[in-house]
Amino acid sequence: MLKLQNYSDNILKNIHLEFNKKQNFIILGSNGAGKSTLAKILCGITPSDIQIENQNLSSYNSKERTKLINYVPAKLEIFDEYLTLNEYLDLSKLHTLLESENMLKLFEIERLRNKPCQQLSSGEQQLTMLASAILHNAKITIFDEPTANLDPQKSRNIFSLLKSKLFQNKIIITHDLNLAYKLQYDILYMKEGEIVFFDSSSKFFTESNLNDFFGLSVKRLDNDIMVNL
């Protein structure tokens, strides 16, 4: 479904990646590992020879690309200071008014519908982007640190959404080991611009790998929690 071969730049080194239909995976790594750089290549923000459905992404027109892949950044960038939350959700024009209303209720942001996006808190902006991503319904959705600005309760709610079938295929960028461990999706682990592991969650979260990648700073306490010591 998605393929990137032998890509290198000033940050990434010899990246080879294939992503199949109905596969969800997590791009995991510390800050500065190259996670967001790779994500911008995968969604076409940074030019490359990436292929989706056996065709170069650049060969699709904008409408086709919109249906194929969607990038949800860690921070909402709005250049129109008067654009309201409702207007932001309507930008894609790929959904009905009822669907938009349902998203406002799902994320409990109905009261904010007429508030300019620039005046929303960072957590409210995060929820707005996630609501928009569900409405967008692209074949592949890339989430960049989806729980970064949320309190613990909202983070748990977003975790449930990421585990749900509301999205067709998911790529989730995070440095949060706990989130990655609980989601149990395939793990692509990056270090210093290189992919050093890409396989199942069960194979990644072994005592041997944890020692190799993190030394004594990480330990598995039970079946649900990973901690940084």
Residue ranges with predicted function:
Residues T141-E145:
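Catalytic Walker B motif of ABC-type/P-loop ATPase nucleotide-binding domains
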Residues Q51-E64:
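ABC ATPase NBD Q-loop/coupling interface
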Residues I187-S200:
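H-loop (His-switch) and adjacent beta-strand-loop-beta switch element
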Residues K203, S208-L229:
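ABC ATPase nucleotide-binding domains
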Residues L98-R113, I134:
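Conserved ABC ATPase "signature" region
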Residues C43:
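Helix-to-loop junction immediately C-terminal to a conserved catalytic motif
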Residues T174-H175:
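H-loop/switch region of ABC-family ATPase nucleotide-binding domains
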Residues P116-L120:
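Conserved ABC ATPase signature
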